[in-house]
Amino acid sequence: MSTSDSIVSSQTKQSSWRKSDTTWTLGLFGTAIGAGVLFFPIRAGFGGLIPILLMLVLAYPIAFYCHRALARLCLSGSNPSGNITETVEEHFGKTGGVVITFLYFFAICPLLWIYGVTITNTFMTFWENQLGFAPLNRGFVALFLLLLMAFVIWFGKDLMVKVMSYLVWPFIASLVLISLSLIPYWNSAVIDQVDLGSLSLTGHDGILITVWLGISIMVFSFNFSPIVSSFVVSKREEYEKDFGRDFTERKCSQIISRASMLMVAVVMFFAFSCLFTLSPANMAEAKAQNIPVLSYLANHFASMTGTKTTFAITLEYAASIIALVAIFKSFFGHYLGTLEGLNGLVLKFGYKGDKTKVSLGKLNTISMIFIMGSTWVVAYANPNILDLIEAMGAPIIASLLCLLPMYAIRKAPSLAKYRGRLDNVFVTVIGLLTILNIVYKLF
C-alpha cells in the first residue's frame, strides 16, 4: 500500500462515526426532551386521529430541517470557535448581535413563565387529587415553589447542574416505560370517533387549523436550539481543521438527523400511547384544566373504579412526581440561559457594557428579582399553557430557529450555496405558520 493510500485510509478511519458523535446525538436528544413534551400529546390528540397522523408525517422534517438550518448559520462564521452571536455580528454587524441577544432572551424567558404556571398547577393537582388535601391559595403555592427553586439555584447551582444532567435519562426512560405500560389500557375510542363523512378541512375545529396549531407545539417540543451553537463549535474544533468545513457540515447534519429520529420516535410513541389510552375528549379536558398529560393520567387512573392493577396505583402517584421533576429540570436549565441573557442586556444598556461598574453578584440579584417576580405574576394569573406556548413561546423560537437562518442564507455570501433549495421553503413556511399563530390567537 502506498503512503498516500495509507494517509487516505487513516483519515477515513478517523473521520468515521466517533464516540463524541454519539455523545452529541444523545445530548441534542436529551436537551429537547423536557417539560414541553408533556403538553404535546394534549395538543396533538385534541383533534383526534387524522391530525396526529399528519403531525407524525411532519415531525421529523420539522425537527431535522429547522435545526440543520440553524447549524448551517452557526457554521458560516470565519472563526471555528465563534458562537452564534459572533457569527451573526460578522454577517450583520453589531446591530445583528444585539438582535440575536434579544431573541435568545425572549425565546427563553416566556418558557420560564410557562414552566412557572405548569409547576404550580401540577403541584396543586397532586396536592388535591393524589394526597387528598384541601386546596391551597394559588398565589402562596406559586410563591413558595419559586422561592424554593430560587434558594436551590442561589446556593447550589453547581450541584444542581450535575443533578439535572443525571435526570435527563431517567426522565426519558420513564416516558418510554409509561408509553409501553399504557398499552394494556389502549382502547378504540379515538378510532371510533373518526367519521370521514363529517371531517372538515377548515373551520375552528378543522383538520388544517388543528395541524397548524400542532406545528407550533411541535416547534416548541422538538426544540434543542439552545445547544446548537455549542454543538457546532465543538464539531468545528474537532473536524474542520483536518477534514474541512463541508465535511463538518455533513457530520453535523448526520448527528442532527439521528437526534431528530430518536426524539420523534420517543415523543410520538408517547403521544400515541396517551391518545389511545384516553380520548380526544379527555385531551380537551386536560387542556381546560391547564395541566400536563402526566397529571391528567394520574387523575384518570385515580378515578378508575373496580380493582386497580399495580401499574395503575403506581402511576396515580408517580406520574405527577415525574412531571414535577421534569418541569423543575426544564425550569432550571432555562433559568440559567435567561439569567445569562438578562445579565448581558442589563450590563449593555444599564451600565453601557462596562463590567467594572457592577459586580456579577449584583447583576445576578437584579436579574433574579425580575425573572422570579415576572414568573410569579404569570403563574398567579394562570393563563392557558397551550395558548401561551402557541402565542409566545413557539413563535419566538421559530423566529430564531427558522427565519433567522433563512434570512442569513439570503443575505450572507458564505451561505450562498444553500440558496434556492426546497428545504429552505419548507423551513420558512414552518416559521411563518408558527408566528402567524399570534394573529390567530388575537382573532
Curated annotation (Swiss-Prot):
Coiled-coil segments on the chain, per record: none
Name under which the protein is recorded: Threonine/serine transporter TdcC
HAMAP family assigned to the protein according to its UniProt record, in alphabetical order: Thr_Ser_transp_TdcC (MF_01583)
GO MF annotation, one: transmembrane transporter activity
Transmembrane segments: 22-42, 44-64, 97-117, 140-160, 163-183, 207-227, 261-281, 311-331, 366-386, 389-409, 423-443
Record-stated family: Belongs to the amino acid/polyamine transporter 2 family. SdaC/TdcC subfamily.
InterPro entries linked to this entry: Amino_acid_transport_2, Hydroxy_aa_transpt, Thr/Ser_transpt_TdcC
Organism: Escherichia coli (strain K12)
Main location group: membrane
Record has Disulfide bond as a keyword: no
Keywords recorded for this protein, A-Z: Amino-acid transport, Cell inner membrane, Cell membrane, Membrane, Symport, Transmembrane, Transmembrane helix, Transport
NCBIfam families assigned: PRK13629.1, stp
GO cellular component entries: plasma membrane
Keyword presence, Cell inner membrane: yes
Entry membrane topology: Multi-pass membrane protein
Induction data: Induced in amino acid-rich medium under anaerobic conditions.
GO BP: amino acid transport; L-serine transport; threonine transport
